[in-house]
Structures are given as C-alpha cells and as structure tokens.
Amino acid sequence: MTSATKTNNSGSISSPIVVALDYANKDAALAFADQVSPQDCRLKVGKEMFTLYGPELIRDLHQRGFDVFLDLKFHDIPNTTARAVAAAAELGVWMVNVHASGGARMMSAAKEALLPYGAQAPLLIAVTVLTSMDGEDLRDIGITISPAEQAERLAKLTWDCGLDGVVCSAHEAVRLKQVCGEDFSLVTPGIRPQGSEAGDQRRIMTPEQAVAVGVDYMVIGRPITQSPDPEKTLREILASLTKVA
C-alpha cells in the first residue's frame, strides 16, 4: 500500500529543524512555506491548523516539497488510534505521533497499522511528558516521580513497542539515548535560540545545546515564524549547528 501524495520517510534532507506552523490562518502558513526551502527544514502541522484546514493543507505543503510532521498526538482505544495512524500514512506525512500514556496495546496497534506501508510508512513517535509540564503538574495528575523519570519510563515502553522514537525534553536526551539506543529518534520541542523568550515552554534548550546532547529533530516555532526574516533566522540557526558538529 502506498500513498498517492508523497514519498515521506525518505531521509532526503539532513536538517534537524522542524518548524511549527502555529499560524492563525492557512494563507499565513503557506506564505511562510514560500519563504523557506524544504532543504533547510521540515514543517509541523498541529491540532489547530489541521482542524481548520485538514488534509488540503498537508497536500499544499507536499506540493511545495516539504516533509510534514503531523502533530496530532493520538490517544484513544487501540483500534481507533491504529486507524488514525493509517489515515496519516495515506496522507503521506513524514512523521506522526501518539501519546505513550495510551499504553502498550495502543502503541503496538499503531505500529502494526503501518506495516502495510513498508518503507513509505511515516516515522511513528510517542509523546512522553509535555515540555510545558513540570513536577507540580505531574503531581496534580497523580504521578509522583519527576518529569525526567516519567519520560524515561514512557520512552522504554515506546521502545518495547517498536516505535521509532519519542517526543521529549532535550534535558532527557542523554539518558534516553543510553536507555533506548542511538537509533531511537528524539524529537524535542522547547528549543529556543539564544535570546528568545521561553513562551509557554518550561524545559527549554538552545539548538546548539540540543544537538550536543543527542537530539535528532528539534521543533522550533515562533523564533522562526515570527522573525522579520524567517529564512535568514533559519539559516543562522543551521549555521550555528554546523559549528557544534
């Protein structure tokens, strides 16, 4: 089974940057996409944009040559989650995610749903602990261990289920690579270039710091999308990463 839209998991670009398209409307998102190169970044479409504009937005971005991370964080009963992940594969997205807290049966069902797509399947990533959450937030929902400990617990479960990696804080990267292996992909939001505001992220790092600790893909939003010159800002971040490498 193959997608009619785009070859997605090709690894055709080397940039670790995924730009979050957190715009109020589709025209603004596409205007941004027209300012940057698909060789310099991938693009993330989240709940708000996808709810408003749906698969058409994904197709518009694919037509411009971009790999798309569909960030919908599926969390439901196993059968429903599996079908949702398969639907994402039909769209030809490069990456899709689920919540690790949905449990082993849910994650295993999602992984199995992608088997018919073979090499065309998107990367399947699980969310561990949202980077907006700290220890107090976890205690409020009955979790008494630290965010780092909870992230490690959920990452191990994700690895056991055969998924490709996790969304996590960059602060957990070193430990998760040790526990789950170098081939286990780490996707990190909460990445802010030096001098940027933290916004609603509490556990943040700079791009250079993230690469140094083993992050594979870093999600950056407003520091790039709200820049007066997004292409220049993106290129500056990429240049800073070559120094780390």
Curated annotation (Swiss-Prot):
BP GO terms, sorted: 'de novo' pyrimidine nucleobase biosynthetic process; 'de novo' UMP biosynthetic process
Any single GO molecular-function term of the entry would be:
orotidine-5'-phosphate decarboxylase activity
Pathway, per Swiss-Prot/TrEMBL?
A: Pyrimidine metabolism; UMP biosynthesis via de novo pathway; UMP from orotate: step 2/2
Report which reactions are catalysed by this protein.
Answer: orotidine 5'-phosphate + H(+) = UMP + CO2
Binding sites annotated in the UniProt record for substrate: 22, 44, 71-80, 131, 192, 201, 221-222
Any Pfam family hit = OMPdecase
User: EC number(s)?
Assistant: 4.1.1.23
Q: Which GO terms describe its cellular component?
A: cytosol
Q: Which SMART domains match?
A: OMPdecase (SM00934)
Determine the domain of life of the protein's source.
Answer: Bacteria
Active-site residues are K73
InterPro entries documented for this protein? Aldolase_TIM, OMPdecase, OMPdecase_AS, OMPdecase_bac, OMPdeCOase_dom, RibuloseP-bd_barrel
Lyase among keywords: yes
Q: Which CDD domains match?
A: OMP_decarboxylase_like
**Which PROSITE patterns would you find in this protein's record?**
OMPDECASE
The protein's UniProt keywords, in alphabetical order, are: Decarboxylase, Lyase, Pyrimidine biosynthesis
Relate the assembly described in the record.
Homodimer.
Family to which the UniProt record says this protein belongs: Belongs to the OMP decarboxylase family. Type 1 subfamily.
- Protein name in UniProt: Orotidine 5'-phosphate decarboxylase
UniProt source species: Yersinia pestis
Gene for this chain: pyrF
